[in-house]
Amino acid sequence: MSDISVFGDSVLKGVIYENNIYKVSQNRFSNICEDILGVSIENKAKFGSTIDIGKNIIFKNIELIKETKSKYVVMEFGGNDCDYNWREISEDPDKEHYSKSSITEFIEIYSYLIDELKKIGKEPVLLSLPPIDSAKYFDYISKKLNADNILKWMEGNKQFLTNWHERYNIEVFKLAINNDIPIIDITSKFLEIKNYSNLLCDDGIHPNEKGHKIIAEAIKEHIEKRKIELIG
């Protein structure tokens, strides 16, 4: 039986992009947290998870969640929800395109999950999103596609990628406030670094191993500052 369960996307899973290959790092934040906090973590995050996919994973593991020793359940979603089908945009930039989860869907499903976890006596804890690097990410998504068409759809503004990602991140903070639950601010820890891009992989969206160390430090600081008892 694990102490704490965590659910989310590839960032939470600990996926890094190295030498054009995605892999799960053994130095991911959850492994670091196990060492520095002295707890066992059941990492149920999954590559590509949107909030809707995450909902299905959480309900599939509801008994595991009930059995974990801690009252806390950690969630981190949004990075895939705000993403688009870049191939479709590349092929037809004049068409209207939609992100994988609309803002409305994202808020509604996340709120539902928070309520359902509270019903079984758990306290949801949200992680905010690490920022992305628009330049790196644009190069990554446009590889083997029509970069000019993608940029046309963005109205010539690569910074749209960062802005749209942050739009969802803001909703994560609002969800925590509106539902009176804890949020661990990962975002600010990255933004404190003058060139936080050095904490990201070459795809511009996944934290590298240095980035995962920063995430673990943010979690540790949050717990120590508030004198939180993880177990009991």
Positions of PLM-derived features:
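Gly/Ser/Thr-rich beta-alpha loop segments that engage phosphate groups in nucleotides
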Residues: 10, 16, 47-50, 80-81, ...
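A short local structural element in Rossmann-fold oxidoreductases
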Residues: 16, 55, 195
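Alpha-helical cap/lid subdomain in secreted, periplasmic
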Residues: 59-209, 213-232
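Structural motif
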Residues: 49-59
